[in-house]
Amino acid sequence: MTLDLPRRFPWPTLLSVCIHGAVVAGLLYTSVHQVIELPAPAQPISVTMVTPADLEPPQAVQPPPEPVVEPEPEPEPIPEPPKEAPVVIEKPKPKPKPKPKPVKKVQEQPKRDVKPVESRPASPFENTAPARLTSSTATAATSKPVTSVASGPRALSRNQPQYPARAQALRIEGQVKVKFDVTPDGRVDNVQILSAKPANMFEREVKNAMRRWRYEPGKPGSGIVVNILFKINGTTEIQ
């Protein structure tokens, strides 16, 4: 039994119990021997009565001044845009008329007296018979007459020849004179170039266009002559 005591009561526990017991004993001792000090008696207070001066009547509390409301400034009038001055169109001044040129007076030439021509008697050696026609003139008179466009068949459509590009680039004008026949069905046949100025420039276009020409059928014609003009502005004219 004696050997188990140290195990049940260890030293740290005993030390803690002793410290707590000492603290409790100290607190009890200080509470018993505490000196109670009485407060010192209060000293007498002397009071002097003073008659208060006539109190001034309380001034009336003035209400706070009302805030002054400033009047809103009137809006400034919007200035009107300046009116545009009317545009005055000046009338064109009439051109001064040219002064008439003074007409020169034609001096009248004095009339000359014309003497009547005396008729001479006919000489027996003079030949008063009309000259005989030569063989060439007689052949021309008996040849086939040339039919003009106005008196020939009536054209239904005549396409204008195309202006050659080379001639138009060189700004060349030209004229081609053509003779042709019209068949009974109104087609153009036997085309002949009578003249071309300049040569070898417009003839091919003229022939190509005349292939498409059409005349009134049933009215054939032969030896019809027309002039085709090529103008510098690229147009053609058939005369």
From Swiss-Prot:
Its main location: membrane. This is Protein TonB. Interacts with outer membrane receptor proteins that carry out high-affinity binding and energy dependent uptake into the periplasmic space of specific substrates such as cobalamin, and various iron compounds (such as iron dicitrate, enterochelin, aerobactin, etc.). In the absence of TonB these receptors bind their substrates but do not carry out active transport. TonB also interacts with some colicins and is involved in the energy-dependent, irreversible steps of bacteriophages phi 80 and T1 infection. One of its GO terms (cellular component) is transmembrane transporter complex. PROSITE patterns: TONB_CTD. Residues 33-239 are periplasmic. Residues 128-151 have a biased composition (Low complexity). InterPro entries: TonB, TonB-dependent_transducer, TonB/TolA_C, TonB_C, TonB_pro-rich. Disruption phenotype: Cells missing tonB survive hydroxyurea treatment better than wild-type; further disruption of mazE-mazF and relE-relB yields even better survival. Sequence repeats lie at residues 70-71, 72-73, 74-75, 76-77, 78-79, 80-81, 91-92, 93-94, 95-96, 97-98, 99-100, 101-102. It is a single-pass membrane protein. Induction: 2-fold by hydroxyurea treatment. Residues 105-118 have a biased composition (Basic and acidic residues). Changing residue 70 to K: In strain: ECOR 31. It holds the Pfam family TonB_N. Residues 70-81 are annotated as: 6 X 2 AA approximate tandem repeats of E-P.
